[in-house]
Amino acid sequence: MNTTPSQRLGFLHHIRLVPLFACILGGILVLFALSSALAGYFLWQADRDQRDVTAEIEIRTGLANSSDFLRSARINMIQAGAASRIAEMEAMKRNIAQAESEIKQSQQGYRAYQNRPVKTPADEALDTELNQRFQAYITGMQPMLKYAKNGMFEAIINHESEQIRPLDNAYTDILNKAVKIRSTRANQLAELAHQRTRLGGMFMIGAFVLALVMTLITFMVLRRIVIRPLQHAAQRIEKIASGDLTMNDEPAGRNEIGRLSRHLQQMQHSLGMTVGTVRQGAEEIYRGTSEISAGNADLSSRTEEQAAAIEQTAASMEQLTATVKQNADNAHHASKLAQEASIKASDGGQTVSGVVKTMGAISTSSKKISEITAVINSIAFQTNILALNAAVEAARAGEQGRGFAVVASEVRTLASRSAQAAKEIEGLISESVRLIDLGSDEVATAGKTMSTIVDAVASVTHIMQEIAAASDEQSRGITQVSQAISEMDKVTQQNASLVEEASAAAVSLEEQAARLTEAVDVFRLHKHSVSAEPRGAGEPVSFATV
């Protein structure tokens, strides 16, 4: 085929589908891997930022609570001193234990602040002063705790107002600065986490948009180089299945879809050529068989006329025999001459009987010819039907065409039967010609014999006055026999001409059947598809380039 159409296609139509799909799937996997990696990274980063923010909040809370716990411990120690004054020893112990626990909680919160993972130079400078004031605060709380255990309420009050409050104020001032720094850092970490989360969301949106764009591009590419060519191929197959072989060629690429389109186009051309050849042969066979049918019908009619003439001849011979018998009864006085005339007449009767038998053989042969021509007519009719079926099966065959092979086998079988019938017709025609020649010779002999009889009868005319009328009747009967024989001769000659025409039509039928067989042999099928194994059976169907 011409490669120009495929050269007008785009580059994508020449890419093989396996590498193309591999690239598409690879791109999807890469995009999925990148998206998963980015999502994992941003999730990990968000978790880390969240833990940092949580840690800063816990550090800030622990640092802020260290002052609150110390203040609560001071209140509990004052309450313990008050309980000791009224001899509430259990209440005093509970308050002292609560105060000691709160001092420990304050120290734990402060140690959490001291052990924070991230420290800036500003934090370290502030930590020195903060640590000094916190330790001074804790140290100042020890005498007050001792006073509380001893039940010295006045000493507790004096120590708290004179020593602890200034320490609390000093610690609170530096504590607020540290808490403010921690709050600022927590806010910064929260903002950073928010920015990273937003950046991760933007990356995910970008990845989704990229995936959507790649999906759209992939769909457009697949629609252009896979879906649309497959739709065209499906439409071509549907039209071929419906019997439409008039579609024009379309451009095809060098990939798998392109090769499929080219093979479909080649199959269409090959199928079109085969169907055209079969159709032409079928039409010619139909015309030839029509001529054979018409000729055979005419031959049958003429054969019927010939049979009627033979029947008329037989009736005339019966009348002639009766007349001769009557003349014999009236010719007793001329026995010798009548005897000789009887002998001659007997010889003539035998000759005429031979003629009758010969004509009977001709009639039998004619009947056989009629039967054979009827067979030819039936075969021609069946051949026409099978040829039409072959055209239909060829249209439905697709790539396999199994049913078409069966029709082709039947067409070859019927063609062989037509050829055999034609040969039998030729043999019978030859036999008819021979019998006709023999009949002609016997008729000539009968004529000579009858001439002798006429001479003998003339010599005794003066004796056979009484049988003149009977002799006239005999003469008229013989004339009718002669006319009937002459008519049969003409009909036989006409039958011979018709048989020759039938033979020519049979030869033409054989040639067309041979052409039809050659056209069908283009298809190579499996062994089980036909009764006789064709050439190249078992091989895949190959399409010729159109």
Swiss-Prot record:
Compartment annotation: Cell inner membrane
Protein transport keyword on record: no
Origin organism of this chain?
Escherichia coli (strain K12)
Q: Which UniProt keywords apply?
A: Cell inner membrane, Cell membrane, Chemotaxis, Membrane, Methylation, Transducer, Transmembrane, Transmembrane helix
Function recorded in the entry: Mediates taxis to the sugars ribose and galactose via an interaction with the periplasmic ribose- or galactose-binding proteins.
User: Lineage, please?
Assistant: Bacteria, Pseudomonadati, Pseudomonadota, Gammaproteobacteria, Enterobacterales
Q: Which ranges does the record list as Cytoplasmic topological domains?
A: 1-23, 223-546
As for family, the record states:
Belongs to the methyl-accepting chemotaxis (MCP) protein family.
Q: Name the domain of life.
A: Bacteria
Q: Which residues form the HAMP domain?
A: 224-276
Q: What is the membrane topology here?
A: Multi-pass membrane protein
Parts of the chain that traverse the membrane: 24-44, 202-222
Q: Which residues form the Methyl-accepting transducer domain?
A: 281-510
Its protein name is: Methyl-accepting chemotaxis protein III
For the Periplasmic compartment, the record's topological domain ranges are 45-201
| Entry's Gene Ontology BP terms | chemotaxis; signal transduction
Residues carrying Glutamate methyl ester (Glu): E305, E501, E510
**What Gene3D superfamilies would the database entry show?**
Aspartate receptor, ligand-binding domain (1.20.120.30), Methyl-accepting chemotaxis protein (1.10.287.950)
According to the UniProt entry, which residues carry Glutamate methyl ester (Gln)? Answer: Q312, Q319
One molecular function GO term is: protein homodimerization activity
Q: Which gene encodes it?
A: trg
One cellular-component annotation, GO: plasma membrane
User: What PANTHER family would the database entry show?
Assistant: METHYL-ACCEPTING CHEMOTAXIS PROTEIN III, PROTEIN ICFG
